Amino acid sequence: MKPDNQAGVKHKGAAKTARIPIKIVPLDEKLKKPEWIRAKLPNGQRFHEIKQILREQKLHTVCEEATCPNIGECFSKGTATFMIMGDICTRRCPFCDVGHGRPNPLDENEPRHLAESVAAMRLKYVVVTSVDRDDLRDGGAQHFADCINAVREMSPATQIETLVPDFRGRLDIAVDILTQTPPDVMNHNLETVPRLYKQARPGADYAHSLQLLKDYKAKNPNVRTKSGLMVGLGETDEEILEVMRDLRAHNVDMLTIGQYLQPSDGHLPVLRYVHPDVFKMFEEKAYEMGFVHAAVGAMVRSSYHADVQAHEAGV
């Protein structure tokens, strides 16, 4: 049996969140899911085709690793969000179901495997995300660039969206590297309001994440920038609106807001289910603030219908 701190050992659920600075306090009684929280069950031939291609190419998707509720619908439509640089994250965010631990070294063949999969799946739009890699000097920025180059070479008509980590401590070098091979959309999720960062995003910094989005836009004015938020962690509506204002002040073009759903009892509990009328209010406010596109609703995730979001934003 491998020691807990050995490279490649993945911790999930309570094993992952046991050492976060603010401990998870479970509710005496879980909130009942309202009737508007519904996802389609995984099914169909296309769903299984996608899974087979991913396994053959030894690729990971955030759809599977983060236990996304929309996996059935997306896979059945032939869309997937690829997760590069392994399936082990160096952070312990207690809202996220991706495993934590010491990651394995980067796979130098991954960009080629990714490009081959995109071609095999005949994808017109692809989202590429990653785990956090605080162990790498550039946070993995060059690996992102290599993946973009490989996909562009094999599928030149395919549009690419990157959903990047925060590259904390490596912002300037990461922005420089990612400017050399720009995607069509650059996404970095703020996830929650600044008051809840220490609890929900240990290791991250709200101002740093905003700066990453602003600096990238400054160097790549023709690339749409995008960010996403969850609701249900204990934030107020006004705090969400304030984050939206901050995003616009940092020149972010596109917005997603969705309902947080607890992946397991070892994760942060859901403290409220936001009513569809409130989501509608957020959407209306987003357009009033000047967002080019806003995807807002209970089942919205940052990569859900990402192609539709991008095309409606003029990409």
UniProtKB/Swiss-Prot annotation:
Coiled coil: none annotated. Keywords: 4Fe-4S, Cytoplasm, Iron, Iron-sulfur, Metal-binding, S-adenosyl-L-methionine, Transferase. Binds 2 [4Fe-4S] clusters per subunit. One cluster is coordinated with 3 cysteines and an exchangeable S-adenosyl-L-methionine. Gene3D superfamilies: Aldolase class I. Residues 75-292 form the Radical SAM core domain. [4Fe-4S] cluster 1 binds at residues 63, 68, 74, 303. Its main location: cytoplasm. CDD domains: Radical_SAM (cd01335). Its EC number is 2.8.1.8. PROSITE patterns: RADICAL_SAM (PS51918). GO terms for molecular function: 4 iron, 4 sulfur cluster binding; lipoate synthase activity; metal ion binding. It is an enzyme of class 2 (transferase). Pathway: Protein modification; protein lipoylation via endogenous pathway; protein N(6)-(lipoyl)lysine from octanoyl-[acyl-carrier-protein]: step 2/2. The keyword Iron-sulfur applies. It is found in: Cytoplasm. [4Fe-4S] cluster 2 binds at residues 89, 93, 96. One of its GO terms (cellular component) is cytoplasm. It catalyses: [[Fe-S] cluster scaffold protein carrying a second [4Fe-4S](2+) cluster] + N(6)-octanoyl-L-lysyl-[protein] + 2 oxidized [2Fe-2S]-[ferredoxin] + 2 S-adenosyl-L-methionine + 4 H(+) = [[Fe-S] cluster scaffold protein] + N(6)-[(R)-dihydrolipoyl]-L-lysyl-[protein] + 4 Fe(3+) + 2 hydrogen sulfide + 2 5'-deoxyadenosine + 2 L-methionine + 2 reduced [2Fe-2S]-[ferredoxin]. Pfam families: LIAS_N, Radical_SAM. The keyword Glycoprotein does not apply. Its cofactor is [4Fe-4S] cluster. Transmembrane segments: none annotated. Belongs to the radical SAM superfamily. Lipoyl synthase family. This is Lipoyl synthase. It comes from Chromobacterium violaceum (strain ATCC 12472 / DSM 30191 / JCM 1249 / CCUG 213 / NBRC 12614 / NCIMB 9131 / NCTC 9757 / MK).
